[in-house]
Structures are given as structure tokens and as C-alpha cells.
């Protein structure tokens, strides 16, 4: 009897250790997804998932081993039920179970599905067992036909994409490096821009125009009454009369 109790303690300790490792791995993965969702890469995610899968596999091996009495042959019975808050139970369960009352015991110690879920599951199983073999075979054949058709469509689309990608010479360039460098030089250091000359031969430091506009309106073609240098010449002709003429309607 003492040997079986010792084996049971060893089994429970191994299960608890594996459960703690599994809990820490899941918590670390959730924390990483919440805090590093912008920088986490796929290999790191797969490594964390593989670690969780390894803990689950180890837990399954421990539970399936024949060390001592199998846990499935044991029954868990509550020794104390109270509707009041139990601080020791809250600390033992890490804040998950504050009360161990008559209403909560069936949910916490349940080893079978809920009665409603169990009845629905039994109804589905009975419906599946009453299905005729010919009808089941026809449904399976139709299902396989649909899957094959979808597989053919996906395979054809993949072949077309691969062919198009292999025949494509490369990404077409949509910008000019020389124009970009010239624009950056003009904006940054004023390369290619000239400073216009204002009235009296004084340079106008507030306006800088490109050479093309400056050549289109040379100083020799500007009349004395025209505006400042740098404006495009107007195509409207005006007739300015002298101020000493008498207005006809006065």
C-alpha cells in the first residue's frame, strides 16, 4: 500500500511539473503575440508552437504509462464544501477558484460531458449509425469528386502563376534615378535654379526660378510697365491711353 502511494505521488508530481511547463510555454507565447506581434517572425512562432506540442506529447506519455495505479481508476471526492470565499483554495489554484460550493463542484469535478451535450452527441451518433451503406458511399464519392475538382482548379492556377512569374523579365521601373537626383539637388541645395534680378539690377533673394522660365521671358522683351521678372508673358494686348484725354461721357 505504501509503495502504491509513493508511485502515485511520483506520478502526480511528474504530471504537475509537465502541466506547469505547459502553462508557462502557453503564457510566454501569448505574451509574445501581444507584445511582439509587429516583429515576430514565422520561425520563432513555429519554435514556440513546437515547444508547446512537446510538452503535450510528454504529458500524454506520462498519463499513458503504467506507473502505479492508472489515474482513470481513481475517483476525486470533495472533502469540504462551503459557500464562503476560501483564501487557501484561491492561492492554491492561482486565483482561478475562489469558492468550492455545492453548485460549482459538478462543473469542476465533472469527468463526463454535460448532460445536454451528451444527449445531443448520442443523437448524432444514432443518426450516423442509421445511415445506409449505399447512401454513405454515394456521399463519400460525391465529396471526393468535389475535392478533386477544387484540387484541379488550384493546381491549374498555380501552374499559370508559376509560368507567368518565370516568363516575366522583372519588375518594370516606374521612376528615373537621374530625375530623382536632380529633384533632390534642386530642393536641397538649389542646384539648377537661378536668382532673378529685380529693378535696378538688385538680385531678388525671395524668388528663384528655373532657367527654362527665365529664358522664356528675357529682360530685353520686358516692357517698363510690366510686372516683376519671373511671370509668364500675357497673351492679352492692352491699349493704355494718356490721362490728359477727356472722357467722352463726362
Swiss-Prot record:
Chain intervals for the UniProt region annotation (Disordered): 217-250
Feature: compositional bias, Polar residues: 236-250
GO MF annotation, one: transcription coregulator activity
Location in the cell: Nucleus
GO CC field: core mediator complex; mediator complex
InterPro entries: Mediatior_Med8_fun/met
Database matches in Pfam families: Med8
Membrane-spanning residues: none
Keywords assigned by UniProt, alphabetized: Activator, Nucleus, Transcription, Transcription regulation
GO biological process: regulation of transcription by RNA polymerase II
Annotated function: Component of the Mediator complex, a coactivator involved in the regulated transcription of nearly all RNA polymerase II-dependent genes. Mediator functions as a bridge to convey information from gene-specific regulatory proteins to the basal RNA polymerase II transcription machinery. Mediator is recruited to promoters by direct interactions with regulatory proteins and serves as a scaffold for the assembly of a functional preinitiation complex with RNA polymerase II and the general transcription factors.
Subunit field text: Component of the Mediator complex.
Family per similarity comment: Belongs to the Mediator complex subunit 8 family.
Name the UniProt record assigns to this protein: Mediator of RNA polymerase II transcription subunit 8
Name of the gene this protein is made from: MED8
Amino acid at each position: 500500500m505504501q509503495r502504491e502511494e509513493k508511485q502515485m505521488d511520483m506520478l502526480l508530481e511528474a504530471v504537475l511539473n509537465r502541466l506547469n511547463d505547459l502553462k508557462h510555454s502557453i503564457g510566454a507565447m501569448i505574451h509574445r503575440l501581444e507584445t511582439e506581434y509587429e516583429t515576430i517572425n514565422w520561425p520563432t512562432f513555429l519554435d514556440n508552437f513546437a515547444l508547446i506540442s512537446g510538452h503535450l506529447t510528454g504529458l500524454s506519455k506520462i498519463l499513458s504509462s503504467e506507473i502505479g495505479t492508472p489515474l482513470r481508476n481513481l475517483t476525486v471526492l470533495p472533502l469540504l464544501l462551503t459557500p464562503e470565499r476560501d483564501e487557501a483554495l484561491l492561492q492554491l489554484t492561482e486565483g482561478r477558484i475562489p469558492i468550492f460550493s455545492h453548485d460549482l463542484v459538478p462543473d469542476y469535478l465533472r469527468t463526463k460531458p454535460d448532460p445536454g451535450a451528451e444527449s445531443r452527441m448520442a443523437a448524432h451518433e444514432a443518426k450516423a449509425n442509421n445511415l445506409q451503406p449505399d447512401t454513405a458511399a454515394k456521399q463519400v464519392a460525391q465529396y471526393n469528386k468535389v475535392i478533386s475538382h477544387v484540387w484541379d482548379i488550384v493546381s491549374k492556377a498555380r501552374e499559370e502563376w508559376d509560368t507567368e512569374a518565370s516568363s516575366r523579365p522583372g519588375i518594370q521601373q516606374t521612376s528615373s534615378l537621374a530625375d530623382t537626383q536632380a529633384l533632390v539637388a534642386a530642393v536641397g541645395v538649389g542646384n539648377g535654379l537661378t536668382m532673378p534680378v529685380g529693378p535696378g539690377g538688385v538680385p531678388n533673394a525671395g524668388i528663384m526660378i528655373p532657367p527654362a522660365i527665365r529664358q522664356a521671358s528675357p529682360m530685353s522683351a520686358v516692357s517698363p510697365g510690366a510686372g516683376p521678372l519671373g511671370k509668364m508673358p500675357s497673351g492679352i494686348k492692352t491699349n493704355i491711353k494718356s490721362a490728359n484725354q477727356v472722357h467722352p461721357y463726362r
